[in-house]
From Swiss-Prot:
Pfam families tied to this protein: Acetyltransf_1 (PF00583)
Main location (coarse class): membrane
Gene label: nat14
Source species: Danio rerio
The name this protein goes by in its record: Probable N-acetyltransferase 14
Region (Disordered): 111-152
Keywords, comma-separated and alphabetical: Acyltransferase, Membrane, Transferase, Transmembrane, Transmembrane helix
EC number of this enzyme: 2.3.1.-
GO molecular function: N-acetyltransferase activity
Length: 280
């Protein structure tokens, strides 16, 4: 496993040049999740009942037990393979797809998320100069390429949400997505991904805590996090950060009424996510 110095990590908004790297990172993080979600949905009681009924009908038609058993499962898996990736990529979003262009609009003007590890090490003069040159070149490219309708981009940016990336010497090693949900005092974390080489280094914790700190400054008092339902690692991670599963309250009626967030729904209406809550 590669060691990562958190003092060298910059937590900044995703820019247009980062979109392909972020998509690849999310795709990598979804590889195991997608298969576990499919297995979870196929083993629900209603799904098993429907598969059994269809298998019985096909057995009478095809006169083959093996084909009658395999065909319904095969068709269901193909269907879920085609429909789940959109949901597995960014979970819990209020929109059916993620607008990466809208999320990156004017991202370079947004200040970085706080990183408490930055005080341990300072960049050398050469590194600072290189970073300034990169930013200057990026601004020039943006001015040349971003000739899209400004009003349209502003409208898209309002509802597109935010993607914050962990940048280590120009390499995107992690990201966290915040939905563009407009409910007052609430923030929704839709996806947290860390590159496989840098897991267990504290990077995920750094991303989430940095986002919590920024949203708290903006008046947000509650954070919801959507975690894929078969992910035990994700559940343990958010519990360690002080989150609780939605519905786990002290028994106070007012708290239980406020403590509600719709989980992402999948095939036959079964939830794809667990919703975790934290009051800031």
């Amino acid at each position: 496993m590669v060691r990562l110095d958190l003092a060298d990590v910059v937590l900044r908004r995703m820019q247009e040049k980062d979109i392909e790297a972020v998509k690849a990172l999310i795709k990598e993080g979804c590889e195991g999740t997608e298969n576990r979600l499919i297995l979870h949905l196929l083993t629900r009681p209603l799904a098993l009942l429907l598969l059994a009924i269809l298998s019985s009908i096909l057995r009478c038609v095809l006169h083959s037990f093996v084909l009658a058993l395999v065909i319904p499962v095969f068709i269901s898996v193909i269907y879920l393979k085609l429909t789940i990736p959109r949901s597995a990529g960014i979970l819990g979003s209020c929109r059916p797809y993620w607008d990466y262009i809208g999320s990156s609009y004017h991202a370079d003007t947004e200040p970085d998320l706080p990183n408490p590890h930055l005080g341990r090490a300072k960049l050398t003069t050469n590194q600072e100069k290189t970073r300034r040159r990169k930013k200057a070149k990026e601004k020039e490219k943006m001015n040349e390429s971003e000739q899209v309708d400004e009003d349209e981009l502003k409208q898209r940016a309002k509802v597109a949400g935010e993607v914050w990336v962990a940048d280590s010497d120009g390499e995107i090693v992690g990201c966290v997505a915040r939905d563009g949900w407009s409910r007052d005092g609430v923030c929704r974390v839709c996806r947290l991904v860390v590159q496989c080489w840098y897991r267990r280094e504290g990077l995920g914790r750094l991303l989430v805590q940095g986002l919590e700190s920024r949203t708290k400054q903006k008046g947000v008092c509650r954070v919801y996090a959507h975690v894929p339902i078969p992910s035990k690692v994700g559940e343990a991670f958010f519990r360690r950060l002080g989150y609780r599963l939605q519905g786990e309250t002290a028994g106070i009626e007012e708290e239980e009424e406020d403590d509600y967030e719709d989980p992402e729904k999948g095939w036959l209406g079964y939830p794809l996510t667990k919703v975790f809550v934290k009051d800031l």
